[in-house]
Amino acid sequence: MKIGILALQGDVEEHRYALEKAAAELGLSVKVVEVKNAQDLADISTLILTGGESTTIGKLAKAKGLEDNIKKATLPILATCAGLIYLAKEAVDRRVGKTRQSLLGLLDVSVVRNAFGRQRESFQTELEVRGFGKVNAVFIRAPAVVKIGPSVEPLASLRHVDYGEVYAAVRQGSVLATAFHPELTTTAFHKWLIREAKR
């Protein structure tokens, strides 16, 4: 089984480690492929969109011809933090409002970038995530999902001082996205991705 990690920017190694650990815990073997161009998408079973900086990820993916190929691939996807933003149908920035950044539009959600503030406002909290139980969630310059479409299932929410209840984890079919970084604290989400790949 080959699992791809979009490796243009962000926490690629943390996801690789979480994937390999998750596979070992399941008694399975996975090959992790760093996806840096369209050819790297061939033969992968699933894809991870990492955290990092969503505008940079989008620009690089477009420049390398990855964006259209990811849209066409219909792969199970795990997206975290900036990956969630890049996957969204709509994104605005907390400070500057509308942005012209490139988005995949594969997840029917509206996202506010940097919703919880900048780096110094990063935090950790315990969240109850439907289907995953209690998760130690690390939010780093985290986005927030403020609106979901009818086909999107909310998995975890928390209160935001400006936006009220916001979503920190959502699922739409075989696409799972989190505003936090599960790769830093748990293998549960990577196990989900491996199981999706086996379907």
Swiss-Prot record:
Q: Which InterPro entries match?
A: Class_I_gatase-like (IPR029062), PdxT/SNO (IPR002161)
Annotated GO biological process: glutamine catabolic process; pyridoxal phosphate biosynthetic process; pyridoxine metabolic process
Q: Which residues form the active site?
A: C81, H181, E183
Q: Name one GO cellular component term.
A: glutaminase complex
Q: Which reaction does it catalyse?
A: aldehydo-D-ribose 5-phosphate + D-glyceraldehyde 3-phosphate + L-glutamine = pyridoxal 5'-phosphate + L-glutamate + phosphate + 3 H2O + H(+); L-glutamine + H2O = L-glutamate + NH4(+)
Q: What EC designation does it have?
A: 4.3.3.6, 3.5.1.2
**Residues engaged in binding L-glutamine:** G52, E53, S54, R113, I140, R141
Q: Sorted alphabetically, which keywords does the UniProt record give?
A: Glutamine amidotransferase, Hydrolase, Lyase, Pyridoxal phosphate
Where does this protein act, in terms of pathway? Answer: Cofactor biosynthesis; pyridoxal 5'-phosphate biosynthesis
Q: Pfam families given for it?
A: SNO
A molecular function (GO) term: glutaminase activity
Name the Gene3D superfamilies for this protein. 3.40.50.880
In UniProt terms, what function does this protein have? Catalyzes the hydrolysis of glutamine to glutamate and ammonia as part of the biosynthesis of pyridoxal 5'-phosphate. The resulting ammonia molecule is channeled to the active site of PdxS.
**NCBIfam families in the record, alphabetically?**
PLP_synth_Pdx2
Q: How does it assemble?
A: In the presence of PdxS, forms a dodecamer of heterodimers. Only shows activity in the heterodimer.
Family per similarity comment: Belongs to the glutaminase PdxT/SNO family.
Identification of the protein by name: Pyridoxal 5'-phosphate synthase subunit PdxT
Q: Which organism is it from?
A: Pyrobaculum calidifontis (strain DSM 21063 / JCM 11548 / VA1)
The organism that produces this protein has a lineage beginning with: Archaea, Thermoproteota, Thermoprotei, Thermoproteales, Thermoproteaceae
